[in-house]
Amino acid sequence: MGTGGAVGVLKASSKKREWFIARVSPNTEKSSRDRLLQMGVEAFVASQEEYRFYKNGDRKKPRKKKVELVVITQYVFIHITEIERRRLVEEPFIRCFLIDRTHEERTFATVSDEKMHQLKLMLGYQDAQVQFAAADYTIGEEVTVKGFGSQEYTGHVVRLRGDKTSYIGVRIDALGCAYLEIAPQRLAKKQ
C-alpha cells in the first residue's frame, strides 16, 4: 500500500545528496535526529546551546547547566538522496517531507549546502539568540556580516517591530527566514 502521494515522483537527480526537510512530532526533533544518526544518516536540528541557572537546594551558588534549545521546531534537516528519502518516509517518527510550494510541479523542499552552512554559522554564534519567523522576508538590502571568524557571511537586513533594530536573515524558501540581531557596526553594505 505505501504512503501514496507522500512518496512523490522520482527525480532524475535521485543520486545527488540534498538537504530535505522532514516534519516530526512536537518535542521529538533531537531524538529523531539521534535515531537518524544511529541509522547512518546525516541529520541536523536547528538548535543553539545556552546556559541555564537553577537553584540548587540549600546551596547559595546556583547550578549552571548547558541546554540545547531547538530554534526551528518540528523539523529535521536530512542530507540524503531521493531514493533514501523514499525509504525514510516509511519511518514512524517522520511525519512527512515538506513540499516546495514555489514550484507548480509537486517537488519536495530542499535547502542548498550554502544555506545550510550559513544557518549552522548563525546557530553557532553565541553572542545572540537566533530566532525563526515563518514569514516571507524579501525586503531589505544585502549585507556582509563581520565577526563570524574567517568566514564571510552574507544575508539581508530585515526590520522587525521598529526601525532601530537591525536583523540579519538567512532565507530558507520552504520554511521562512532565520534571523539574528546584529549590532549595526558589524554590518557592511554588499558591494
What are the residue ranges of the model-derived segments?
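Acidic-enriched and Gly/Ser
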Residues: 2-142, 158-167, 171-191
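Short, surface-exposed secondary-structure boundary micro-motifs
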Residues: 148-149
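Beta-strand residues that line the small-molecule/cofactor-binding core
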Residues: 152
